A protein has these predicted regions:
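A glycine-centered beta->alpha junction motif in the catalytic cores
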Residues: 157-182, 195-202, 216-229, 298-299, ...
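A conserved alpha-helical element in kinase catalytic cores
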Residues: 56-71, 113-159, 175-196
Length: 372
């Protein structure tokens, strides 16, 4: 059989946030992004904790499994001829995201077509939960119209494999770094988030502030191990975050993305698709607002050395969100800004360690202290 390859994708999809040197700024190991260097060999994980890793290494098995799972998505006369898998994000022992390129014969005698879907491999059954969550979102207004989520195509319990539709378009991150006017895009991002918080989805896992504090305490310990000079400030911040959070309790949990950032928003014409719902929980909606604003700070720092580069965009986002919010708290926003800056300090110190990482950690911890 003649081998056919899909064309290289433009800058869209679930790429990990990249710094100027291309390293991941998330607590994960990035194997590739939607803009991987042409011709560069990409490492393919062989993780015994991920049953589906075999599908990344065995082409015939992958094509057979994919063909079965996508039988309802493919047309009645369509045949999947072959497939290729390009990993781009890997969390050892937890999950691996990859681009699945499909070569399809639409009908006997017709020219073959190339299509893409998203594949996600999990260690446990979290993919089944994500599948159900996306179904819930789509039944609550995210299947059509201006604001969207990917369509979940299939989940296989044996391989712990989730398949999703590919999101065409441009990442907000790319638009921001392109120095174009993104004012309307920023407001649309706020609109998507408002719709999520108000969509009425009730099913899914829940997060408490106490559990969130436990995660921060673990991150504090890890940062202290590699940067002991920061331990006193970390301890003080954690104590102040706890006190402020207890004082501001009483909020109502809503559906929250919990990883809402410019890396997970894809624009295509009049549509905006949000990606990556692995961290979804019912939680305080103000956390999503603060998380997005903090990641604009990170984007500015890592790509221009100026943490404040996108502060105008962050303020535009906040104002747009507040204008449409049914319930808004400036005090809780400041609390979660401190939390988000605390987390980013952890990522920079423990996960990424870019050049001058201590200065970057100090900057984010300083921001956390300032907003509390």
């Amino acid at each position: 059989m003649m081998r056919l390859a899909c064309a290289s994708p433009p800058s869209y999809g679930e790429s990990a946030e990249q710094g100027s040197a291309g390293e991941s700024l998330r607590p994960e190991t990035a194997l590739a992004t939607a803009r991987a260097t042409p011709g560069k060999a990409l490492a393919v994980p062989n993780d015994p904790a991920l049953p589906g890793c075999a599908l990344l290494h065995q082409s015939e098995l992958r094509t057979k499994v994919t063909s079965r799972l996508l039988a309802n998505w493919l047309g009645p006369n369509e045949q999947l001829l072959e497939s290729s898998a390009v990993p781009w994000r890997y969390v050892p022992g937890k999950r691996c995201n990859f681009q699945l390129e499909l070569v399809i014969a639409p009908a006997p005698g017709a020219a073959v077509e190339c299509r893409r879907v998203i594949g996600k491999l999990y260690a446990k059954d979290h993919g089944a939960k994500v599948y159900r969550m996306l179904q819930d979102f789509r039944s609550h207004g995210f299947a059509r119209g201006r604001f969207l989520v990917p369509q979940p195509l299939a989940y296989d319990a044996q391989w712990k494999l989730l398949l999703l539709t590919w999101a065409e378009g441009e990442l907000l991150r790319s638009l921001l770094l392109g120095d174009s006017d993104v004012s309307e895009r920023i407001e649309e991002a706020a609109g998507w988030l408002l719709k999520l918080h108000q969509c009425g989805v009730t099913r899914g896992p829940r997060l408490t502030f106490r559990r969130h504090l436990q995660t921060l305490a673990q991150q504090k310990q890890r940062v202290g191990e590699v940067y002991p000079e920061s331990d006193g400030l970390l301890e003080d911040l954690l104590r102040r975050i706890e006190g402020r959070g207890v004082a501001l309790s009483g909020w109502t949990s809503r559906p929250t993305h919990r990883d809402f950032s410019p890396d997970h928003l894809v624009f295509n014409g009049g549509h905006l698709t949000a990606l990556d719902f692995d961290e979804f929980r019912h939680y305080d909606p103000m956390f999503d607002v603060a998380h997005f604003m903090a990641h604009l700070r990170l984007l500015g720092l890592r790509n221009s050395g100026a943490m404040t580069r996108f502060d105008d965009e962050a303020e535009r986002f906040r104002v747009a969100y507040q204008a449409g919010a049914r319930e808004y708290s400036a005090a809780r926003l400041r609390l979660y800004q401190a939390v988000a800056h605390f987390k980013l300090a952890y990522i920079l110190a423990v996960v990424v360690k870019p050049p001058a990482w201590k200065e970057a950690v100090d900057a984010f911890l300083g921001e956390a202290r300032q907003v509390l």
